[in-house]
């Protein structure tokens, strides 16, 4: 877990436990909220603010959720590097000599038409696929041959295009599960509930409560995941990913199925995550959202990088326009401002469901 304990409300903090003790709740309040393995019909709905009134202070929540600030790294330095990465499935080359980096403290958008290789690149970074050639370097060390849980421990967390939650567990329990990657307690320690295990569990619950408040679902901490709205399930998945204390948060189409108001709210959350000290990789089909929230965009087409730059640079690049509209550069030049059938059709990826290339 992070070494910082702002406000003294972590496992070893005095103020938070004093507040709970004064109301006669102390650790029992955590037990009421978090009972792994318990068979409950439908737990009572409890707002985080009822258990931890301190978390009504957004500055305190931001401090609890922020990554470990004892790590000294400059914003703008490469955090993850794709170095000449090729991923091949039999005769199909899904990624072809792909090179780009993700810099500390930025929101990077990864876009491209269906089948461009976005999901393959995403999976190569997070350990689902191993590169056929080249390497993925994260925080100075190659990670391409590591097992997925080791990559998570190194500091890469992800969400999924299709929501993957533990539906019969509460929102709080789902987030606490995410913190398991940072636990140091042995299996015997957990079985016999040693002081170290209890301390780590208290830490995990406290931070999970802060994360739920941070993403906007603090009022639903004890609701089962299956009972949450679609938008809240998306936010819960982000909270669970943040519970692993990542250096890099990878979001796979987080706005899929959202209405315009929900997308605006999501954009605010993604910026908030970046501003709190995280680095974010975003795959998303909604170009308005991508352009509005990212600091830089990398564009893939047929498994190759065709553009890398600021949102304004990328969206005005003739190669990118041609890739999205499906017309040659020469036709775009000859028909600038025109309204031919391809131009009227708009980007082929709007409303798409993901890469054709897995």
Region locations from a protein language model:
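N-terminal intrinsically disordered, low-complexity tails
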Residues: 10-45
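Glycine-rich phosphate-binding loops of nucleotide-dependent enzymes
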Residues: 2-5, 14, 32, 37, ...
């Amino acid at each position: 877990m992070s070494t910082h304990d702002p406000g003294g409300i972590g496992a070893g903090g005095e103020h938070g436990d004093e507040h709970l003790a004064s109301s006669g709740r102390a650790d029992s309040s955590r037990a009421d909220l978090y009972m792994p393995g318990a068979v409950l019909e439908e737990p009572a709905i409890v707002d985080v603010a009822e258990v931890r009134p301190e978390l009504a202070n957004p500055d305190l929540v931001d401090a609890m959720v922020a990554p470990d600030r004892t790590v000294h790294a400059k914003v703008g330095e490469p955090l993850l590097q794709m170095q000449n990465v090729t991923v091949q499935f039999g005769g199909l080359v899904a990624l072809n000599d792909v090179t780009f980096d993700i810099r500390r403290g930025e929101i990077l958008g990864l876009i491209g038409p269906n089948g461009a290789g976005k999901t393959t690149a995403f999976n190569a970074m997070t350990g689902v696929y191993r590169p056929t050639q080249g390497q993925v370097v994260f925080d100075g060390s190659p990670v391409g041959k590591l097992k997925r849980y080791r990559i998570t421990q190194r500091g890469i967390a992800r969400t999924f295009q299709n929501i993957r939650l533990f539906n019969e567990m509460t929102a709080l329990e789902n987030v606490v599960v995410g913190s398991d990657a940072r636990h140091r307690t042995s299996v015997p320690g957990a079985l016999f509930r040693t002081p170290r295990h209890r301390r780590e569990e208290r830490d995990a619950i406290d931070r999970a409560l802060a994360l739920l408040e941070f993403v906007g679902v603090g009022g639903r901490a004890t609701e089962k995941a299956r009972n949450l709205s679609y938008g809240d399930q998306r936010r819960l998945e982000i909270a669970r990913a943040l519970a692993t204390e990542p250096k890099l948060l990878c979001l796979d189409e987080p706005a899929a199925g959202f209405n315009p108001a929900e997308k605006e709210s999501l954009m605010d959350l993604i910026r908030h995550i970046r501003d709190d000290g995280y680095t974010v990789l975003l795959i998303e089909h909604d170009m308005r959202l991508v352009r509005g929230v990212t600091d830089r965009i990398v564009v893939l087409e047929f498994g190759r990088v065709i553009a890398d730059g600021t949102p304004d640079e990328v969206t005005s690049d003739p190669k990118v326009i041609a890739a999205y509209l499906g017309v040659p550069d020469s036709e775009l030049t000859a028909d600038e401002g025109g309204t031919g059938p391809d131009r009227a059709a708009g980007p082929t990826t709007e409303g798409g469901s993901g890469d054709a290339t897995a």
